[in-house]
Amino acid sequence: MQTTKFFMIGMPGSGKTTYLAMLSNVLVDGNSDTKLYKKVEDMPEGYEYFSDFGKLLLECKELGRTRRLVYNKLRISLWDALENEYLLDVPDISGEVFRDLVKDRQITQEIVDRIRESDCLLFFINYKNMSWEYRIPLPKEITDKKNIDAKKKEILDSNLADKREANQSEIVELLQTILDLKLNRPYIRFVLSAWDKVEAEKGKDILPSKFVEGMFPLLYQFVETNSKYFKAEYWGVSAQGGDFQNPEDVKRIEEEEYNAIKVIEPTGKQSSDLTALLYLG
């Protein structure tokens, strides 16, 4: 059996729970065409928790944020077309935990262990739930890690005490902290949530990497500068399929059901398969 462990990272409101809840729906329903599937007799561990959120999503209702002290995980054996087995073990941790990691440099040993044991880090970002301060022009002369760190610290020190949404400098700070905890060269998939809204603003042909380059220049430059230290990919995901505040979107989602889901791979290939994000083959 091939054991694949993921760890999900993201500030509050970045889309982690929405992804896991809709993934649970898709796996249990079993009628969607996916790269990975569960056997009929297997039920995901933790499904009881995520099913409540899943029902809300199917009713086109927004989810609340994960409570800080609540620690849940989705654990299930999945299979690919060649009958290779993958043990999916993904914890759902409140975004406030990661905010505290940036602000106070505090984190539990259990989370440190999970980060180090992971085969792939899923780093969730929802640009709609970020402060406008993150849109900071990056001077051309900022090209090496030392200068990026200095610029990032300057911005971070002036903003971190606030209780508003995360900004770009905090995202970079979180990424660097996570990298410092890993003991080997990590594999990171940046998951850009609410991709339906990205396409509505930027057009359907935009690649996830180009969106990050234009919207998050500080993050993009950090990733490019440090590419020898970790492997990175950019994915676009709309797990709920649209804007629940938009009546036209709600009508479309109700008609299309799981087909409303959008998953955009780094190459631009589009599907409605949430398991594609978990497939490392």
Give residue spans per PLM region.
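Short, flexible helix-adjacent loops and helix caps
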Residues: S32, V102-K103, A200
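Switch II of P-loop NTPase G domains
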Residues: R65-L122, K128-P137
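Conserved GTP-binding G-domain of TRAFAC-class P-loop NTPases and closely related GTPase folds
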Residues: V112-R114, C120-G281
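Conserved G1/Walker A P-loop phosphate-binding module
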Residues: M1-L69, W79-L88
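Alpha-helix-centered segments that form part of catalytic cores
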Residues: L57-S77, N159-L175
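Short, well-ordered loop/turn elements at secondary-structure boundaries
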Residues: Q2-T3, G13, N84-E85, R116-S118, ...
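Amphipathic alpha-helical scaffolding segments
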Residues: A21-L27, G95, I107-T108, L138-T143
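Short, charged/polar micro-motifs that form catalytic or ligand-binding hotspots
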Residues: K5-G13, N84, L101-V112, A161-Q168, ...
